[in-house]
Amino acid sequence: MRSQFKDEHPFEKRQAEAARIAQRFKDRVPVICEKVENSDIPEIDKRKYLVPVDLTVGQFVYVIRKRIKLPSEKAIFIFVNDILPPTAALISTIYEEHKDDDGFLYVLYSGENTFGEQNEKEDGKVKKIPIDISELDFSCINEPGV
């Protein structure tokens, strides 16, 4: 997905800003947060965040929920490079693994699970993990307590 922020600001300007932020705020990472195009979820009031390095993905999702005033019964999904990051992962870890060449981490959010699955490596092979509980296979469960 194309970032509106990238479209509006030239690479050199974004890179210089991210470098300045990294030098000035050692305990924070620069994040651009944007809504997935055509998502039925509210637009966020600001896109640029300086996120503490010890914040988890789940805590950042909470920040997004509050900023868009999303009720707790509504689902929200965030994506980094078209994957769903683990909620327990630190933003600093996600930043190191997925930051853009310009120095920003680009996070997209949506009310739908746009990409459908989360990938996980097992024995060097990518395995698909269903995200929606309706995709789970419970046929191996015969009786309670078994």
UniProtKB/Swiss-Prot annotation:
It comes from Lodderomyces elongisporus (strain ATCC 11503 / CBS 2605 / JCM 1781 / NBRC 1676 / NRRL YB-4239). The C-terminal 30 residues are removed by ATG4 to expose Gly-116 at the C-terminus. The c-terminal Gly is then amidated with phosphatidylethanolamine by an activating system similar to that for ubiquitin. One of its GO terms (cellular component) is cytoplasmic vesicle. Its main location: membrane. It is found in: Cytoplasmic vesicle, Autophagosome membrane; Vacuole membrane. SUPFAM superfamilies: Ubiquitin-like. It is a lipid-anchor. Pfam families: ATG8 (PF02991). A lipid is attached at residue 116 (Phosphatidylethanolamine amidated glycine). This is Autophagy-related protein 8. Residues 117-146 form a propeptide. Keywords: Autophagy, Cytoplasmic vesicle, Lipoprotein, Membrane, Protein transport, Transport, Ubl conjugation pathway, Vacuole. PANTHER family: MICROTUBULE-ASSOCIATED PROTEINS 1A/1B LIGHT CHAIN 3-RELATED. The record marks 116-117 as: Cleavage.
